[in-house]
């Protein structure tokens, strides 16, 4: 019986490469000359800290980071940026989290969306991923298209496709 897993993962090595590329761009840009601006990737907590001297520059740095992440194959929706920018001393910073795994509320939405589609497939929640099984490959591919097309605020990957 064909099956596949729906997961949401971010490759930390690609994220590190994107952060390094963004840091290089900031060093060479004229509008960031003589400005304390940096990116810091924390592998353990899966966060990226964006630091600068003003809140406007933090927003510019976030735009640069999103562009570099997209070039490295990481969607911008996988970056969870809080609304408030923290001011500490003479610096402003924001700590953005990289979304890893699918939250239970999103999992339930996906399973409900699959069941409402009336396709002959079964969806099971397994930890932070969803296993979808069905008799027809076409039904599974229709589920993939539906999950990609659904606006769930998070990028999804499909792994372990078995016939």
Swiss-Prot record:
Gene Ontology molecular function: nucleotide binding
Disulfide bonds, paired cysteine numbers: none
Keywords: Nucleotide-binding
Domain of life: Bacteria
A single cellular component GO annotation: cytosol
InterPro entries linked to this entry: DUF520, UPF0234-like_C, UPF0234_N, YajQ-like_sf
Gene3D superfamilies reported for this sequence: 3.30.70.860, YajQ-like, domain 2
Record-stated family: Belongs to the YajQ family.
Cited function: Nucleotide-binding protein.
Protein name: Nucleotide-binding protein YajQ
Organism in which the protein naturally occurs: Shigella dysenteriae serotype 1 (strain Sd197)
């Amino acid at each position: 019986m064909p099956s596949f897993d729906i997961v949401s993962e971010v490759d930390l090595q690609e994220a590190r490469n994107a952060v390094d590329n963004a840091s290089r761009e900031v060093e060479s840009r004229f509008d960031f000359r003589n400005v304390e601006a940096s990116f810091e990737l924390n592998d353990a907590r899966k966060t990226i800290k964006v630091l600068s001297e003003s809140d406007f520059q933090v927003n510019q740095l976030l735009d640069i980071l999103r562009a570099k992440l997209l070039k490295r194959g990481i969607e911008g929706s996988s970056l969870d940026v809080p609304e408030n920018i923290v001011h500490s001393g003479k610096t402003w910073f924001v700590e953005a989290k990289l979304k890893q795994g699918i939250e239970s509320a999103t999992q339930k939405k996906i399973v409900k969306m699959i069941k409402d589609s009336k396709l002959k497939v079964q969806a099971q929640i397994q930890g932070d991923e969803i296993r979808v099984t069905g008799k027809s490959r076409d039904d599974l591919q229709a589920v993939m298209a539906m999950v990609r097309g659904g606006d769930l605020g998070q990028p999804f990957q499909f792994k372990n496709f078995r016939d």
